[in-house]
Amino acid sequence: MRVAFFGTPLWAVPVLDALRKRHQVVLVVSQPDKPQGRGLRPAPSPVARYAEAEGLPLLRPARLREEAFLEALRQAAPEVAVVAAYGKLIPKEALDIPPHGFLNLHPSLLPKYRGAAPVQRALLAGERETGVSIMRLDEGLDTGPLYAVWRTPILPDEDAVALGNRLRDKGVELLLEVLERLPELTPRPQEGEASYAPPLSKEEGRLDFGESAEALYRRHRAVQPWPGSYFFHRGQRVKALRLRPEPGEGEPGVVARVGPEGVVVGTASGLLLLLEVQPEGRRAMPAADWARGYGVAPGTRLGQV
């Protein structure tokens, strides 16, 4: 089929790569270049870089309602468009152009976790199960009817990166199956109570030791790779790069013990073992080395700004 692809982050690149091996990608649409790095120089998105490297037709419109973009989409004459983490709602003027509409690969069990951060929000909420949905876009936020759904348990130590990649990879399989049979398929309306998954804020990475160790571990897994989890010590931000819950009890925010494996901190329920950290302005280091260098010992209180 003639396919237009809409996507932006690195997560979406394997979707585009799989599509171009089975179908004719007639247009790639990604978000405009954004400032990146220390110099804040405009840089293309990962999807745009891939499209340029592979010689695929590429557009980076600021607004999808612009007539110049809509005309370019018409001229590309896609039979269907595929969306994977594009980052903007597609207006009706564009939705109506491909004869078979727009398909969206969404990593949740719709109608649960509509929006930008479904994987992260499912982890934060402590969901035991999630999945991926292939849907037909309408004008709403992930409200369109479903072509295919795949369910899976969330593995105990999966973070947002690993879970998101696993859901994407299965989603690619589903997407290709749907495209093979698209003319004969009829999508079904979403059923059940809807929930929403807004983007994460930087503050949501902060570890509050007044929560349980299990909740803190869920938070740590959910906020990878951005914003990452962190806490404060003596007014400085410390990134928590690796951690895990431990059995036992301790006073929330107070170091219970320090050993070769790391720093054990009390929480509202259970203990949290810090394995690797990165103090503000410093390199990553084992938590035990950080404790020695920064005077962290049993009885030290963490988490205070």
Swiss-Prot record:
Entry GO MF terms: methionyl-tRNA formyltransferase activity
GO cellular component: cytosol
Residues reported to bind (6S)-5,6,7,8-tetrahydrofolate: S108, L109, L110, P111
Catalytic activity as recorded in UniProt: L-methionyl-tRNA(fMet) + (6R)-10-formyltetrahydrofolate = N-formyl-L-methionyl-tRNA(fMet) + (6S)-5,6,7,8-tetrahydrofolate + H(+)
Keyword line: Protein biosynthesis, Transferase
Enzyme Commission no: 2.1.2.9
InterPro entries xrefs: Fmt, Formyl_trans_C, Formyl_transf_N, Formyl_transf_N_sf, Formyl_transferase-like_C_sf, Met-tRNA-FMT_C, Met-tRNA-FMT_N
Similarity-based family: Belongs to the Fmt family.
Function recorded in the entry: Attaches a formyl group to the free amino group of methionyl-tRNA(fMet). The formyl group appears to play a dual role in the initiator identity of N-formylmethionyl-tRNA by promoting its recognition by IF2 and preventing the misappropriation of this tRNA by the elongation apparatus.
Protein name, per record: Methionyl-tRNA formyltransferase
Species name: Thermus thermophilus (strain ATCC 27634 / DSM 579 / HB8)
